[in-house]
C-alpha cells in the first residue's frame, strides 16, 4: 500500500499523481506499487513540489508496519528508535533563530 498526501502543490503535480494513484480525498492519493515505481513517483513529487509539502507512506517489513518520507516546508522527520519509526516535529524555520 502506498499513500501520498500533498498540501499547497501546483495543479500539474496533482495531475501527475492522478495518473498513477487514486485520489480518495483532496490531496490524498492511494495505490499499490513496487519500490521501483514508488521511487519514480516520489522523484516526480520532488521535481514538481514547488512551495508545497508532501508525505509518502508505504507498507514495510518493520515493527511499525510502515515507513515514510517527507518533503517541503511542513516537514516532519522519520527517526528510527530501536527499530520503531517515530516522528520528529521540526521547529519552524525563523530568521531570528540561531542554530544550536
Go through the PLM ranges and name each one:
Residues 1-5, 9-100:
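Basic nucleic-acid-binding interfaces
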